[in-house]
């Protein structure tokens, strides 16, 4: 067993997540591809695959138990975070991964092909210009600088009625919450525990007040 696999198993052991053998292999395969492509494409500032397991894989999959619904979009996905790890954790759900940069979308397509991930659709577009045929149960992001930007640029993406925004944040974002537009309200703030990651992590669930 590789050192990377041992590390992944040890990290998962510190959570309540159920991760089967195929999922573990896909998560490792993703880290290996990210590490390989990163040298040429500069996809992430995290250079060490062991650190990627903590800062990218675990930091994404701890959100998996909180995804209600079937159809999700990860906006500003970058190299596929948190979308690819979440798609691996939820093969029964559908994920759209959106980014405006072609090199990131090319990388994601290669990951989907090599790891045989079949529940992901890639979208190369600016988020405010993307008009989906069908709206989403959840709009995910860990890339946006502020939640106000996120909800204003993505306001057209959640389903009317039950669609939500899911913002992955560090510290409890009280200031950002205070600045949210009138039409948006906080449904829930979930404190996340990521093994071996320093600092706080929170998942903020937002919805339209007229839902």
Swiss-Prot record:
What does the UniProt keyword field contain?
A: Cytoplasm, Methyltransferase, rRNA processing, S-adenosyl-L-methionine, Transferase
Binding site residues for S-adenosyl-L-methionine: 76, 81, 127-128, 142
Gene3D superfamilies documented for this protein:
Vaccinia Virus protein VP39
Primary residence: cytoplasm
Catalytic activity, EC: 2.1.1.170
Where is this chain's protein located in or outside the cell?
Cytoplasm
InterPro entries annotated for this entry? Answer: rRNA_ssu_MeTfrase_G (IPR003682), SAM-dependent_MTases_sf (IPR029063)
- Catalytic EC class: transferase
**Any GO MF annotation of the entry:** rRNA (guanine-N7-)-methyltransferase activity
Task: Report the Pfam families cross-referenced here.
Answer: GidB
Substrates-to-products reaction catalysed: guanosine(527) in 16S rRNA + S-adenosyl-L-methionine = N(7)-methylguanosine(527) in 16S rRNA + S-adenosyl-L-homocysteine
GO CC field: cytosol
Please tell me whether the keyword Cytoplasm is annotated for this protein.
Answer: yes
Superkingdom: Bacteria
Function (record text): Specifically methylates the N7 position of guanine in position 527 of 16S rRNA.
NCBIfam families per record: rsmG_gidB
Q: Which family does it belong to?
A: Belongs to the methyltransferase superfamily. RNA methyltransferase RsmG family.
> HAMAP family annotated for this entry?
16SrRNA_methyltr_G
PANTHER family attached to this UniProt entry: S-ADENOSYL-L-METHIONINE-DEPENDENT METHYLTRANSFERASES SUPERFAMILY PROTEIN
Kindly provide the name given to this protein in its UniProt entry: Ribosomal RNA small subunit methyltransferase G
Source organism of this protein record: Vibrio vulnificus (strain YJ016)
